[in-house]
Amino acid sequence: ILDGAIHGCLLFRPLPRHLDEAAVCAALSPVKDVDGITSGSLASVFSGDGQGYPPCTAQACLELLDYYGFEPTGRRAVGVGRSLVIGRPAAMLLLNRNATVTLCHTRTADLAAECRRAELLIAAAGRAGIIGANCLSPGQVVIDVGINVDAAGHLVGDVDFAAAEAVVGAVTPVPGGVGAVTTSVLARHVLDAAAKSADISL
């Protein structure tokens, strides 16, 4: 995408069936990949070299931790969910901040025990209520990235919020939690991309 008037592009997936996702991603310049979906952007997240932009939601998790003064260094973090959109990038961003990270998923043996050991728990499995009371420990920080619709048609996260609120040190709600921060991260990425394009220092 060579149009100099465009500074950032978002790719909403799944794409229509007639479009080749790999070809679309290959056509997207890393400098305009403001949501970290291309292989080049993800490689920079995994290598920790600071080039490109990480996926906005994964970075939003770190922004929340920074805002509330939670320092990841030396902390035991558990991520539930292994997608390239949230789970894996969030794990890499935490590793780059010196956390000790365990990445779990819906087929992890004894998921509850893994979760209970965490000081920081990021739920991004895409399964409503997968993180229940049996997964939680006092004092934990829990970031719920899940977006699901329950049987009553309500928007809910991956975490049983009522159970978490009674036990953990802090938990993000759904809706009204990570999503708002994700939007702010996206806006910052676009602004940064525009500034780089114009050779302006922010």
Labelled PLM ranges:
Residues 12, 49, 82, 174, ...:
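Conserved short-loop catalytic and cofactor-binding motifs
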Residues 7, 201-202:
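Core catalytic loop region at the nicotinamide-binding pocket of NAD(P)H-dependent oxidoreductases
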